[in-house]
Amino acid sequence: MGKKPVQGGRASARRSGGWGKKRLKGFWLWLTVSMVMVVVYFFVATLYRVPSRAMENTLRAGDYLLLDKLHYGPQLPFGLGTLPGLGKVEAGDLVVFQIPDDPSRVYIKRCIATSGQVVEIINKATFVDGIRVADPPYSKYIDARIRSGSNSTRDNLSPFEVPEGSLFLIGDNRDNSRDSRNWGAIPQQSVLGRGLVVMFSVRPKEEEQSRWDSILDFPSRVRWERIGTWLQ
């Protein structure tokens, strides 16, 4: 009878040790998953929400895009530079980038021209190296008026050579977009990645809607037909 407490103590110790091993395994699993998520977020892909109507009808405000960071080369955190990518930005790509003067502002625009190319806009028509560039399939113009180059660069832009290491980016909603026609060329180091596919889409709530009403109205605001749309 004197051995029973000893046996019970050993069993208790074994149970305690087994529980400790399970906790340790759980910790390492959590740590591994967390590290993988961090690597994917910083170096591979993440979601980007389209904030405005400047890319209609290609994109809609409230679209959530899969942002491919790997292709152009992911930016390292803390301003440590950019890793080599799989390819370069090309004309026609949908590029997500930071405004150089305000990195907190992140936009998506279409690349029209790259380093060394000359961009000119004549009465809303875009030319690159003297050749007329066809409008993207879902681009649009909402204002039939033509503004002179002396008053605005929206519809008329004198020949502009894109500097080395820079890009000329324009919104598909040509009459309702602030882009390289206003800011000039965007440095390639400001590029975060390229938009690939619409992962989710929801129509922004009305300004006068309360938070509770917007929650109740959420299912009707989801654009189900846009989910899975590949960008072009």
Indicate residue ranges for each PLM-predicted region.
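Soluble "head" domains of membrane/secretory-pathway proteins
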Residues: 2-27, 39, 43-49, 53-232
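Hydrophobic alpha-helical membrane-embedded or membrane-associated segments
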Residues: 29-37
